[in-house]
Regions:
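Ser/Thr-rich, Pro/Gly/Ala-heavy low-complexity intrinsically disordered linkers and tails
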Residues: 1-45
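Structural beta-strand segments of beta-rich domains
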Residues: 202-206
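Acidic, Ser/Thr
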Residues: 209-211
Length: 294
């Protein structure tokens, strides 16, 4: 499964709104203090909203895989802070897509455990996964609970019937809620063309038949894994559009080493909540592989 780990494009280049914090991301001790004093402790997610990439600390996903009708899984993971390597703004963007380049890391002295040299040239704290994550999935009066056993978060197969659920995320004394939301259907007649090939991509074009129950078509294209960087392109368009075009300048920087690693698309419904510790994004989604004929 493509790990639901992706970040977001700017608010002005996608259909969903972006929820942002009023202040810069705080450190672990500040975050702990906020958790102790902030009111309320329960935060309702806003349907259709997303987290800004440099502010997201958590991700909840209820998802299906193309070709596996009726089978659903769910996952939830939360960190204490957002990743400080993520750029706050896209380097390139258009109406559908954004290309985000990892912030340059400045040299610094030896860093203690849990820290690394950051863009400021000083040792910077890196995200630490919460181990007390609990995800409640509700359907009518039935509830399924997934609990984290380690830093990987909470995950498992959804055993409740249906494809529409309410969810509740709990960690660090906080709760994020989202009302009944349906996993959107697989997109029919999904095809793709990659111009220029995987080594020198010049354009990517996707087409599909718009569904009656249309949400958002989303794709996260990371830089080749050999680069080991938080650099990526993300695109999101209404699934009712039936087409997506990605320009070459947003693809070519990702195709280093062994080439472009396009990982498919997602038909997704987004929601997000800005908590006292940071932004949490929720996705109800169907993953689909696309064979790129070029």
């Amino acid at each position: 499964v493509d790990s639901p780990d992706s970040d977001v494009v700017p608010a002005d280049s996608i259909s969903a709104d972006t929820i942002s914090a009023d202040t810069d991301a705080s450190g672990p001790s500040d975050a702990a203090d906020a958790a102790d004093t902030a009111q309320p402790k329960v935060f309702a997610a806003v349907a259709g909203a997303r987290c800004a990439p440099a502010e997201r600390i958590g991700l909840v996903s209820v998802y299906a895989q193309s070709g596996s009708p009726g089978a659903l899984d769910a996952s939830a993971a939360v960190n204490d802070i957002a990743d400080p390597r993520l750029a706050k703004a896209a380097k390139l963007s258009d109406a559908a897509c954004g290309f985000f380049e990892q912030l340059a890391v400045a040299p610094c002295g030896p860093c203690p455990s849990g820290k690394m040299c950051g863009p400021s040239g000083s040792c910077t704290a890196m995200p630490v996964a919460a181990s007390d994550v609990k995800l409640l999935i509700r359907s009518g009066n039935q509830v399924q609970t997934l609990e984290a056993k380690d830093a990987s978060g909470a995950y498992g197969t959804v055993t409740l019937a249906g494809k529409s659920f309410a969810v509740e995320l709990q960690w660090a004394g906080l709760t994020v809620t989202l009302g009944d939301t349906a996993v959107p259907p697989e997109l029919a007649e999904l095809t793709g063309k990659l111009s220029g090939g995987y080594d020198k991509p010049s354009a990517l074009d996707l087409t599909w038949t718009p569904p009656a129950d249309a949400a958002t078509l989303f794709t996260h294209i990371p830089i080749n894994h050999h680069a080991g960087a938080q650099t990526f392109t993300e695109c999101a368009v209404p699934a009712s559009a039936g087409t997506l075009h990605v320009d070459g300048p947003m693809l070519l920087p990702l195709s280093v080493s062994t080439g472009l690693e396009f990982q498919g698309i997602e038909h997704v419904r987004f929601a997000a909540a800005q908590t006292s510790l940071g932004c949490v994004e929720l996705r109800f989604q169907t993953f689909q592989y696309v064979n790129l004929n070029y």
